[in-house]
């Protein structure tokens, strides 16, 4: 790897490797070359439209305020927007394919036609998957229209094996075509109305089943209300049959579907099925949940039959119609922070508006570029030596895909680095101030996007089939003027109240794009931008890697010797923005005069605790705040969001159920939770060391009069507590907790001194705090038992697990103490999973995907 590339990424070898292995083409050795390659292609489309726009001038006064005064984009200005991954980052296939001679699609995701209810239909869908995968991209299919098991068929079998029986066929096709560098990813969805839904819910409990696909259930409001009310629910096939046409009192439940227009119905208890959904989600991380009515009510495309979504892409952020596709781009939010990590830090809202306006314009250009690349695919198919009979299905697929692409002109404009943006502004991720700033950013973003897509409709024409009366309700007429009354779904209703100027212009002139924004996974993108990923909080700002020491090396620091006698050196890998923060601060006041490479784990822990990421990492965030943040993001996002709520392994089924219910009520379109360890059967466990079978009692070492102590502030059951941990040799020895009433809520270090029996004081910065007062008997028992366990040598990891097994909810006292103690689990013990590619245990789960922080492997790209 060349030195210049390493220097470009500020010595971040992971970023350099990801770019070189995934995106460099045609001998490229530097990202500037890739950015120039892409800018040239975008500019080609831009110049074409500018010629048309400049021929007439009567459109100027119709444009938005910014649209009237902006300068035309050039190849140079487009390049500057891409350069250094600072503002706009085209995702995945766009970076690797645009401007090359590869015969591939620029789209990141597709939804295929649902399989027809016949073997021929199923076979055709299988073929469609193959043809999409071979040109890159993930695909979603909905199998709700395949008949239930044991229903009548007009063949020698006489009865169907059911919709679920074909899932492995589609999954195996995905795994097959994903080999040798070709990229396959699959989402299979099923309507909760389907009589086979229980088999669908349970199928991935068998870890050998459907291993090549994500699965999700389409949940409607009627089912969710039946769960809430512990009521009955009617499964039916066809799934879109209306209950109201059934004379339910006069029909025999479970009557077989005859294939003649009759309906197969089945009466169930909704809560029983919901409990099975929660069990699978908690223990196996699937199925995901799609809140289908929420999606339809908040999707601008859903009021149009020809664009109404039928399924989502594999990561769940793009709901699409059959043969529809989307091309993704992400905007780096960190770049809008002026004076990051200082008291003067603030957002440049003017620049946010401009960049999102221009980004959407580039996204529209990308639609035309995709049409060109599909033409190349079509010409390649036509020139292939196979007979027309063999080629016809693939040819038809790409012709329909091009037509759908140009008709709706979908754009998938997203964001990344939200977590780092908040840290740079000195906000905790889930603070009230953070929620307010997120809302302000999203409103500015939406205003820019609306202005752009309406301006583009004026300049270039609206999407095919636009009809203002499908979208808005108005009173009055053109002669006397009209008043915007509201929208025909919740999305247009929101526009008519929150963006009144844009709504009226959209009613008059239309818009260019049927749908235009999303929040997609940005695993590889965030490695290149060197920021937090998507809208997720940072997982951790540092982690430790071990490097094996060559026996011939001399004078090398040895940090660890394993059971085989091999010597290892530990070194820190710093999150790039954490490193930027350290460079902007005088870290010597906390860890002394040290170079970054000399920082040990204790140094990093000390710095982390005074950084803006402290108590704002993925495992620190209260799940209700995560849902509230996602709801704000969703309100101002036209499609959906890929995001994951991380939960401890001891979370209860009831808590998982509450999280999903809360998300549905908050208006989310889809939701994913990841319970720590729930995919341990899928990923490879590294915990293979034999356990000592002997049992011994162990006496506690004598307590010194004085211990090093750390005080943390936490909330349990609505009360604020100070939790003080006493340590010997940096290992926890005892735990105290009591009510905290002071204003200053910052953690601090000091000394715990035993004054006399049952009287301990905490001395910090000249202040004395009592540590054994104001606790209930239950709270005192918890801390005493925790202290006794630590003093007698219990592994802190198992103590945390036991505290988390209490029946209380996530905010109970025992679990609040566990959250503090978890910070003391030694590096390397927190994760028992390892990456299938590089073997690292630095595996996290975010944005719906497992990701390796060591090599960059991500299921979502």
Regions inferred by a protein language model and the residue ranges of each:
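Extended catalytic cores of very large enzyme megasubunits
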Residues: 1-794, 798-806, 844-846, 857
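Domain-level detector for trafficking modules
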Residues: 807-823
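Short, flexible, mixed-charge glycine/proline-rich loop motifs
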Residues: 823-832, 841-846
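Cys/His-enriched microdomains
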Residues: 833-836, 850
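Short, cysteine/histidine-rich loop/knuckle motifs that typically chelate Zn2+
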Residues: 836-840, 854
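Short cysteine/histidine-rich zinc-coordinating motifs and their immediately flanking basic loops
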Residues: 846-852
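Short metal-binding segments enriched for Cys and/or His
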Residues: 859-861
């Amino acid at each position: 790897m060349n030195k210049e590339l390493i220097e470009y990424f500020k010595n971040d070898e992971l970023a350099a490797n990801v770019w070189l292995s995934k995106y460099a083409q045609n001998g490229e050795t530097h990202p500037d070359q890739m950015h120039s390659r892409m800018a040239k292609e975008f500019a080609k489309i831009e110049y074409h439209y500018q010629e048309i726009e400049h021929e007439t001038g009567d459109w100027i006064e119709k444009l938005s305020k910014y649209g009237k005064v902006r300068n035309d984009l050039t190849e140079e200005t487009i390049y500057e927007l891409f350069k250094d991954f600072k503002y706009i980052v085209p995702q995945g296939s766009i970076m690797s394919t645009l401007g090359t001679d590869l015969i591939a699609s620029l789209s990141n995701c597709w939804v295929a036609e649902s399989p027809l209810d016949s073997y021929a239909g199923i076979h055709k869908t299988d073929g469609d998957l193959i043809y999409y995968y071979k040109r890159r991209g993930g695909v979603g299919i909905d199998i709700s229209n395949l008949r239930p098991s044991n229903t009548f068929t007009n063949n020698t079998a006489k009865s169907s094996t059911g919709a679920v029986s074909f899932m492995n066929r589609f999954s195996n096709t995905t795994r097959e075509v994903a080999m040798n560098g070709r990229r396959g990813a699959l989402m299979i969805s099923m309507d909760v109305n389907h009589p086979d839904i229980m088999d669908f819910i349970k199928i991935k409990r068998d870890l050998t089943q459907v291993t090549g696909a994500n699965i999700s259930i389409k949940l409607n409001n009627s089912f969710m209300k039946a769960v809430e009310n512990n009521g009955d629910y009617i499964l039916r096939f066809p799934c879109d049959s209306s209950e109201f046409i059934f004379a339910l009192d006069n029909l025999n439940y479970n009557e077989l579907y005859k294939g003649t227009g009759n309906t197969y119905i089945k009466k169930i208890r909704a809560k029983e099925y919901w409990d099975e959904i929660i069990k699978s989600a908690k223990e196996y991380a699937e199925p995901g949940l799609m809140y289908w009515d929420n999606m339809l009510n908040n999707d601008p495309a859903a009021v149009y039959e020809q664009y109404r979504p039928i399924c989502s892409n594999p990561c769940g952020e793009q709901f699409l119609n059959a043969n529809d596709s989307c091309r993704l781009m992400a905007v780096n939010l960190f770049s809008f922070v002026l004076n990051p990590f200082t008291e003067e830090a603030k957002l440049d809202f003017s620049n946010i508006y401009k960049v999102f306006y221009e980004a959407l314009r580039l996204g529209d250009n990308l639609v035309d570029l995709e049409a060109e690349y599909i033409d190349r695919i079509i010409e390649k198919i036509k020139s292939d030596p196979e007979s027309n009979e063999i080629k016809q299905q693939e040819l038809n697929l790409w012709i329909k895909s091009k037509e759908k692409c140009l008709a709706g002109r979908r754009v998938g404009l997203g964001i990344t680095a939200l977590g780092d943006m908040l840290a740079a502004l000195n906000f905790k991720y889930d603070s009230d101030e953070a929620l307010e700033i997120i809302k302000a950013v999203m409103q500015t973003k939406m205003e820019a996007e609306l202005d752009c897509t309406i301006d583009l409709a004026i300049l270039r024409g609206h999407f095919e089939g636009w009809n203002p009366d499908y979208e808005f309700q108005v009173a009055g007429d053109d002669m006397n003027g009209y008043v915007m009354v509201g929208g025909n779904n919740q999305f247009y209703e929101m526009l008519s109240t929150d963006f009144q100027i844009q709504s009226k212009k959209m009613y008059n002139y239309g818009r260019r794009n049927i749908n235009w924004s999303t929040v997609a996974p940005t695993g590889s993108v965030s490695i290149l931008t060197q920021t937090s990923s998507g809208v997720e909080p940072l997982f951790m700002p540092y982690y430790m890697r071990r490097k094996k020491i060559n026996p011939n090396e001399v004078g090398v620091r040895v940090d660890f010797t394993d059971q085989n006698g091999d010597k290892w050196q530990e070194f820190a890998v710093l999150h790039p923005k954490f490193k930027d923060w350290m460079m902007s601060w005088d870290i010597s006041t906390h860890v002394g005069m040290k170079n970054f490479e000399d920082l040990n784990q204790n140094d990093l822990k000390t710095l982390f605790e005074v950084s803006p990421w402290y108590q704002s990492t993925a495992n620190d965030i209260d799940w209700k705040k995560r849902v509230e943040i996602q709801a704000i993001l969703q309100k101002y996002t036209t499609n959906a969001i890929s995001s994951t709520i991380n939960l401890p392994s001891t979370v209860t089924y009831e808590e998982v159920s509450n999280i999903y219910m809360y998300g549905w009520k908050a208006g989310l379109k889809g939701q994913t939770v990841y319970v720590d360890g729930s995919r341990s059967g899928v990923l490879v466990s590294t915990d293979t060391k034999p356990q000592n079978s002997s049992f011994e009692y162990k006496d506690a070492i004598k307590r010194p009069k004085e211990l090093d102590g750390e005080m943390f502030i936490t909330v349990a059951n609505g009360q604020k507590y100070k939790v003080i941990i006493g340590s010997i040799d940096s290992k926890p020895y005892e735990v105290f907790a009591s009510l905290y009433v002071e204003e200053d809520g910052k953690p601090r270090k000091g000394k715990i001194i035993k004054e006399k029996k049952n009287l301990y004081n905490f001395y910090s910065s000249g202040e004395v705090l009592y540590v054994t007062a104001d606790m209930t008997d239950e709270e005192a028992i918890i801390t005493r038992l925790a202290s006794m366990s630590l003093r007698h040598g219990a592994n802190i990891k198992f103590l945390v697990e036991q505290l988390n097994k209490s029946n209380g909810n996530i905010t109970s006292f025992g679990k609040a103490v566990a959250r503090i103690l978890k910070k003391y689990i030694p590096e390397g013990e927190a994760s028992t999973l390892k990456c299938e590619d590089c073997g690292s245990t630095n595996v996290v789960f975010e944005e719906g995907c497992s990701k390796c922080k060591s090599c960059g492997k991500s299921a979502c790209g």
